[in-house]
Amino acid sequence: MTFAPAVFLLALSGAPALAQSAPAPRDVTLKAADGTTLKGTYYAAATPGPAVLLLHMCNTTRKSWEPLGPQLAAAGIHALSVDYRGFGESGGDRADALAPQDAQRIVTEKWPGDIDAAYDFLISQPGVDRTRVGAAGGSCGVTQAVNLARRHPDVRSLALLAGPIDPDGLAFLTQTPWLPVFAAAAADDQYDDSAPEMMQWILSMSGNPRNKFSGFKDGKHGTEIFGPHPELPRQIVAWYADTLVKNPADPKAAVTVKNTPTRQFWQKASTPDGVGAAVQLFYDTVERNPRAIVIPEAQLNLLGYGHLQAGRITQAIQLFRLNTMLYPKSANTFDSLGDAYLANGQNELALRSSEKAIALLKDDHSGEERKKAIRDSAEQKIAKLKGDKK
């Protein structure tokens, strides 16, 4: 079934020496284009300098950035965190009371303008250098941070914590290799077993040689990692001190893209005639180095469905089979493979894959809503296939 997306420490140096004492954080009120009230917290630095916009996860509020905001200000980097509409102290219909389709509509139609309003507020503050801005996002905020950079070329650095990226954001990063990206995730992420792989994949697709990944064995999801790992906020401060203060990223500078095996795999697998070569590249590469290619389950699943919906069934089967090999405990990978086998008229294989998906659900770590969707999808195929046998 298709779902929109969601080794360790590559250490950064410690945070830079603290600057002058920054003013106390202050709560601010912003207005969205339609008049909706948005609440934020502004962390002003004591001296002029760059700034960072902080975008929270969809199971938290702007307060989740409190371990980071004051540290940025103390390092001479202004920062603003903001509650999305429907979250925290911001106005709008409560996000947790909306039907999924209504919530997604607001994310698509309203959030970009709301985040732009927060960005405009940030760069208008005294002392903020509007040519050196960063964005940080956790979970659902990852896509929002990347797409903010897509809309505003003065965003020169990103920090992304355990979240997926949408097609527009992915296309932007692959076409903007000068933009440096920091990413972090924990292996015990309760929402995505492959969160570390997802974040390393994003870095590989970006190709910037300055990209950094910080992985943790524990810490759970996104900004939740701040609790057991106070070194993560310090790493993010050090990241922005490097990419916005000491050595600001320059969109006009020549960049030698890191053409990693992961990036090569995706370039091949995204083309109609390149899937076979991509799969062969995968096997050849991992035979030499099992960790050389990073493929997140959700992204490979979406890529497979892209081929399936375009009528390239054989290519879809190749990718879905690879996904079941990489993630053999995932019910969704087998349900997706069942879809492709069914489309190809391979009914016995479709039945086996669907039954395997059902069997895996009892130990699947997905949320209940997602598990129900997988079960419904697999059971529909099983009923059809067993009915056809009668």
Which residues are covered by each model-predicted region?
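C-terminal catalytic histidine-bearing segment of alpha/beta-hydrolase fold enzymes
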Residues: N208-S270, S377, K386
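Alpha/beta-hydrolase active-site loop
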Residues: S64, P100-P126
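Primarily recognizes the serine-hydrolase "nucleophile elbow" in alpha/beta-hydrolase
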Residues: A117-W178
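Conserved alpha/beta-hydrolase
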Residues: L72-L98
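The feature captures the conserved acid-bearing segment of alpha/beta-hydrolase catalytic domains
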Residues: S157-G215
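The serine-hydrolase catalytic nucleophile loop
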Residues: C58-P70, Y84
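N-terminal cap/lid segment of alpha/beta-hydrolase-fold proteins
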Residues: Q20-A45
